[in-house]
Amino acid sequence: MSAVRRAGELEITSPSNPRIKQVVALRRRREREQAAVTLVEGQAEIKLMLAAGGRPKALYYCAELTGPSGLFVADDASEHGAEVIRVTRPVFEKISYREGPDGLLAVVPALSADLDQIQLPVNALVLICAGLEKPGNLGAILRTADAAGVAAVIAADPVTDWGNPNVVRASKGTIFSVPVASASTDAVLAWAAKHELRIVAATPEASQILSDADLTGPLAIAVGAEQTGLSTAWLERAELRIRIPMFGLADSLNVSTSAAIITYEAVRQRLRVGELNQREWAR
């Protein structure tokens, strides 16, 4: 794809175009759910989404902003069935939802968030995010999950949806490489029991530090919102309660940081006992 408009390629030059208004409306959860789509912005994020098997319905690109590498991504999206639409800079700046846009935005089918569709491997490691409010934290946890080979990330009683553009952005596209689901606390607890997952609750009130806990075998690590922590339901059902040792004045860490520390302690232990080997982990 070149910077010159190709024959038959749709081009939109007006920010008031009805189609552009529809894209902007997808920032709202209700509109995304009704259309069963979400937005992915950014060259790196769209490349990862395509590599993970995502198939965009449409891709909007601005040649002035994206450069040659972005045009190759647009070509790749087109080869995978996406309608590619060229837009002017003012149009792209209207549909963009982040600072410093690089001229690529895709509309993709909504992710399945059905708990029953999650398939777990032997000795699965699962992350459960209970009542998390901030999309940025969910996205950051997805990046950790992808890097650590986590089997799934489950949102229990979610405040936001997986299709929130800020979740997608903070995940750097890894939301398309890690299975996700959403359900009520009761449903997630029942699902964990069905799959014989030991529940480990992360709480600053725990007496046991994470390095002293056995984090091998089928395991679900539960983290809660920073202000309220895990609910009584999680604390009562947890087989283990663990904390991260703190030596300063603060009594807790950002939830995504906590999730990363605990997850990598679990990975360390699994590598040590042979549940993972370096090659499998790196995949």
What are these regions (language model features)?
Residues 74-107:
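Glycine/small-residue-rich loop that forms an oxyanion/phosphate-binding "nest" at active or ligand-binding sites
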Residues 200-248, 254:
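Active-site/ligand-binding-proximal alpha/beta "capping" segment
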Residues 12, 38, 130-131, 156-157, ...:
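Glycine- and other small-residue-rich loops at beta-strand/loop junctions that grip anionic moieties
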